[in-house]
Amino acid sequence: MNEPATHRKIAIEANNSTWEILAKPIAEITTDEAEEMTRRAYAAAYHWQRAEGFGPANDARAEWLLSRVWAVRGNGEVALGHARRCLSICESTGLVDFDLAYAHEAMARAHACLGDSAAARQHLESAGNVSIADPQDKAQVDSDIAAAPWFGVEQ
């Protein structure tokens, strides 16, 4: 199981299967599904770190996914920890564009979950100010920003 190609395959599967649950309306996610979603997101992060071709973008995206999962679960403290790591990876490795926008989206959502509307709005503005070259990537970021939960913070 130490084959980097195998880790990559499992990371992709775990990441995509996390979205099978995350894509559901929050009110429809059961307690068991929330636990399963969390396990899948951590599994994805674990396998990405050992995957063939692993780089800072994989690391940042794994942290983003963990932040999103914890925000959906209503745990802002844990969500914020992963969001901070996501943003730190972007800033320390020069990731911009899509990844930097998502890092700010994660920060915004985690702050919103914690009830800090001012910080949430600041990071939403930062996410919106990131230049994203690919129109499809921009549409994906915008779609995710439009998705719940925002805990009463307007996007």
Q: What are the residue ranges of the model-derived segments?
A:
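"A position-specific structural signal for the A-helix of alpha-solenoid helical repeats
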Residues: 16, 65, 99, 106, ...
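Residue register of alpha-helical TPR repeats
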Residues: 12, 59-61, 102, 140
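Short coil/turn linkers that connect adjacent helices within long alpha-helical scaffolds
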Residues: 4, 50-54, 91-96, 132-136
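TPR repeat positional signature
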Residues: 7, 14-17, 21, 40, ...
